[in-house]
Amino acid sequence: TGEKPFTCKECSKSFSSNSHLSRHQKIHSGVKSFTCTECDKKFLTRSSLLLHQKVHTGEKPFICTECGKGFSAKSQLHRHHVIHTGDRPFTCAECGKTFSYKQSLVTHRAAHTREKPFICTECGKSFSHKNNLQTHLKSH
């Protein structure tokens, strides 16, 4: 019926079941209890680990019907499709620049606001771009 009676106390996001809420709450705890046996990289959820493991197997079962490029996850294929449609629905209110992805707009906005929304859970250092945080995380 669309009811979502289970609410996260950290961010107020609601869920239809307690198990979905529990899975979500791992995001806030930062505890990465799932480890890849190939490279020792750690993940918050089992599903994230399983998706990552396709990097090692090279498995790419989701194929773009436009260009034939393969992806390891359905979500990656959907994200890829904008390359072919040219759709850029996200517009910067500050300068009018348009983006295909919401996250690209969020990252771009940091240039105007000097925001640093990407925060290291290990030491608290913040970054304006996700890739800078990812590079930093390798130093821990």
Swiss-Prot record:
GO terms for cellular component: nucleus. It comes from the Eukaryota. One of its GO terms (molecular function) is RNA polymerase II cis-regulatory region sequence-specific DNA binding. The keyword Cell inner membrane does not apply. Pfam families: zf-C2H2 (PF00096), zf-C2H2_6 (PF13912). Its main location: nucleus. A zinc finger (C2H2-type) spans 6-28, 34-56, 62-84, 90-112, 118-140. It is found in: Nucleus. One of its GO terms (biological process) is regulation of transcription by RNA polymerase II. Keywords: DNA-binding, Metal-binding, Nucleus, Repeat, Transcription, Transcription regulation, Zinc, Zinc-finger. May be involved in transcriptional regulation. Belongs to the krueppel C2H2-type zinc-finger protein family. This is Oocyte zinc finger protein XlCOF15. It comes from Xenopus laevis (African clawed frog).
